[in-house]
Amino acid sequence: MLAFFRFVVRWSWRLLLAVVLFFNCRLYWPSPLAQNTNQVPGALRQQLNANAKVLTSGAPHRMQQIFPEGFYFCHVLHGLTWIEAAQRDTSLTEEAIENAKLAYKNLDSQECRDTFPSDLPPDHGAFYSAWKVHLLAGIVMLQMQEGASKEIALTEKETDLAELQRLCDDWQRLFQDVPSPFFESYHGGIWPCDTLPAIHAMKTCDRITNQNKYQGTIDQWLKDVKQTLDSETGLIPHLNLADGKQTGQGRATSQMIILRMMPDIDEAFARQQYELFRERFLTTFGGIPCLYEYADGQGSSVGDVDTGPLVFGRSFSATVFMIGVGQLYDDQPVADAIAVAGEAVGLPWTWADEKRYVGGVLPIGDIMVAYSQNAKRWSDGQGHCPQERSSIASGWRWKVHLYSSPLFLLAVGLWWLSLIHI
């Protein structure tokens, strides 16, 4: 027994010291984010390669067993990542269109449709329909931009544009017929963030066609949304009742989708919402910037089907999305801090021109990281530089060193114990 104890002590301090030193040193590696919106992140190609491979090896089906929209999100986020990559680097346009159309085909499959209620308008409910038209809007946008192959048949462009307009028309009629800015994704379930991709698609369609066909609907939607804001946080709420009345405060998981889309819809409102959100939700964990799921951490610390597991009230899925949102609002220090820390915690591994995190055990997580690191606005704008830089992102590495110092001292203590007493 004594020999076993000696073995444990002698190797425990080595392992603990190695982990602490590796993690703290890893924080000084360069940020994986591109510092220029005309460049893609350095490892994006390797991430896309890895994600494409798992998408064809059953990962979406496995993720569907874990998350309610696992199959759907795997494909749609991968397609959107390609779209925004081509916006950063137009030389990727042709390849991006091909991959985004493949993602769209998977969303349009019967297997994917069967996950959602077929009787909910406008097409299998708000979630399914909104993200689908959002992806199609991105495809059509790329078909029209410089860098698109001239070999793309004119009929293909016309067909895709006509389909985009048809889907946007369906949404416009729904907004006109129903006295609510939000609609059911599932029977009895309304999540306001599920509508944002459709509004974003309508705005994109207007820009593509140089028309304002949907602007009146968008303006009325914004007016109605501002009447439903959560009185506690001033944000768009997480859940709404079927009659359109707000229930529940704004939450980080839904705010990440809302804030990701809003700059292309209404810059001023987006800026206001981001400032409110950052003030109440941005926090730290062990010194690393991250997000509370509930404002000021005053809510459930367990999590639910929307958030996944929470750690002391922190949402790691929302924190990953914050990498992209921070870039869109010119909050680069926060985005960089989360991204750099994620490279340390996620233990990325690049092999055979493929990059995966934590050995690729959670493919949807890898897809979310690529989507977030590659975030790009779909329209030109004035930027959203926060009025004040976040103090949380200032000197955050030193805070991590401070919080991890007890583990370092424990390793030293075990080392001393192994030398002196055994």
Indicate residue ranges for each PLM-predicted region.
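Extended ligand-binding clefts on enzyme/binding-domain cores
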Residues: 127, 158-159, 178-180, 188-317
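Hydrophobic membrane-insertion alpha-helices, especially the h-region
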Residues: 10-27, 407-413
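Juxtamembrane/start-of-transmembrane alpha-helix segments at the extracytoplasmic/lumenal side
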Residues: 388-408
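Structural helix-adjacent loops and short alpha-helical linkers that scaffold large soluble proteins
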Residues: 30-45, 85-101, 139-165, 206-219, ...
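Conserved small/polar residues in nucleotide/adenosyl-binding loops
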Residues: 420-422
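Extended ligand-binding groove/face enriched in aromatic
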Residues: 67-70, 74-76, 80-196, 374
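Low-complexity, Ser/Thr/Pro/Gly-enriched N-terminal "stalk/linker" regions
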Residues: 18-84, 98-112, 155, 159-172, ...
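Well-ordered alpha-helical segments within folded domains of soluble proteins
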Residues: 23, 70-86, 124-141, 190-206, ...
